[in-house]
């Protein structure tokens, strides 16, 4: 179903069970096929490929040569019906690739809302990308990666499969992430190492001074005081009641399968 207010270029090809909502525009030579829904006000520019099952929310901007909903690059993938779900107000720049999930995991690749995905970003199968994230040019996520809200993954930085990039963290350019990055932490290098707290980012997002100081103490407990991970957990846990923002550290420690960058 194509809404009467949608603007579809004559050279675009649309086939299958496609729903295009009000005020969507589809540019020349774009190909949309399968069980695809494109939400109100989304702009799909020229030469884009969108395949199903894929659901895209409202007011997104999708630039030329982006490919969304293609099969995963997992050798175990056998054509199963898996999905991509994308939220609202994302900017998806040229040649970004977002692949469908696999039945070996969640079966869905998800991207939240208000993200900036720069040129040539790759988001592999079963990734979970939150809200308000920036991924620089040629940043890549292998399968099963989680990137939490407000994280920044700078240009040319790959993230190993099953890793988590914590909320409000900052990955420097051309870094290689092979273990989990705790929330609020700045990290860089090959392999990626911690080098402080993303204080400027926290100030911009309205964190209180007391919260930032508590986050710095948690960072010192984890990296500067010679503690084991278990000892750091104990120190951080002492401040959870006064500073619930620290819960993100403990949540990551609990679910980590790759280990924490050290």
UniProtKB/Swiss-Prot annotation:
Keywords: Acyltransferase, Cytoplasm, Lipid A biosynthesis, Lipid biosynthesis, Lipid metabolism, Repeat, Transferase. The keyword Disulfide bond does not apply. It catalyses: a (3R)-hydroxyacyl-[ACP] + UDP-N-acetyl-alpha-D-glucosamine = a UDP-3-O-[(3R)-3-hydroxyacyl]-N-acetyl-alpha-D-glucosamine + holo-[ACP]. GO terms for cellular component: cytoplasm; membrane. One of its GO terms (molecular function) is acyl-[acyl-carrier-protein]-UDP-N-acetylglucosamine O-acyltransferase activity. It is found in: Cytoplasm. It holds the Pfam family Hexapep. InterPro entries: Acetyltransf_C, Acetyltransf_C_sf, Hexapep, Lipid_A_LpxA, Trimer_LpxA-like_sf. GO terms for biological process: lipid A biosynthetic process. Its EC number is 2.3.1.129. CDD domains: LbH_UDP-GlcNAc_AT. Pathway: Glycolipid biosynthesis; lipid IV(A) biosynthesis; lipid IV(A) from (3R)-3-hydroxytetradecanoyl-[acyl-carrier-protein] and UDP-N-acetyl-alpha-D-glucosamine: step 1/6. Homotrimer. HAMAP family: LpxA. Belongs to the transferase hexapeptide repeat family. LpxA subfamily. Involved in the biosynthesis of lipid A, a phosphorylated glycolipid that anchors the lipopolysaccharide to the outer membrane of the cell. This is Acyl-[acyl-carrier-protein]--UDP-N-acetylglucosamine O-acyltransferase. It comes from Aliivibrio fischeri (strain ATCC 700601 / ES114) (Vibrio fischeri).
